[in-house]
A protein has these predicted regions:
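Solvent-exposed, flexible loop/coil residues
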Residues: 43, 67, 106
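Flexible, glycine-rich active-site loops centered on histidine and acidic residues
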Residues: 2-9, 70-104
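Positions that flank functional sites
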Residues: 38, 65-66, 97
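N-terminal beta1-alpha1-beta2 module of alpha/beta enzyme domains
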Residues: 1-62
Length: 106
C-alpha cells in the first residue's frame, strides 16, 4: 500500500521541499500540494526542486484547474519534469475551490 502527504506551498518553498524529503525518508510514496495562483506559491516550480531532492517520490497537484491553467503549458511542464526526473509526476484535474466558482456563486 502506498501513502502520500499533502502540503500547502506556503513560503518558504525550502520548507516545503524539506518536509517532502522527510516524508520520503519516512516511507511516503506521494507528495501532493494544492494549486492556487492566488493563495500559495507556484507549485510547479517547487515540484522541480522536490523531484531533485528526492529519489523515488511521485509529486503533483491534488487538483489543478483547467480554468486557470493553459493545457498546452501544463502538458509541456509535466513532459519536461518526467524527462528530467523520470516518470515521477501525477496530476489531479478539476476546478476545486476556484475563484470562478466563488464569484459565480456555484
Amino acid at each position: 500500500m502506498d501513502f502520500g502527504v499533502v502540503l500547502q506551498t506556503n513560503p518558504p518553498a525550502s520548507g516545503v521541499i524539506a518536509m517532502m524529503q522527510r516524508a520520503e525518508e519516512a516511507g511516503f510514496s506521494y507528495g501532493w500540494t494544492w494549486d492556487s495562483h492566488v493563495l500559495w506559491q507556484e507549485p510547479f516550480v517547487i515540484y522541480s526542486r522536490i523531484l531533485s531532492a528526492t529519489s523515488a517520490m511521485t509529486v503533483g497537484p491534488m487538483v489543478t484547474n483547467p480554468g486557470t491553467r493553459d493545457w498546452s503549458v501544463i502538458a509541456s511542464l509535466f513532459a519536461t519534469l518526467n524527462d528530467m526526473y523520470g516518470n515521477r509526476t501525477v496530476c489531479g484535474i478539476g476546478r476545486a475551490s476556484c475563484r470562478e466558482r466563488v464569484y459565480s456563486g456555484v
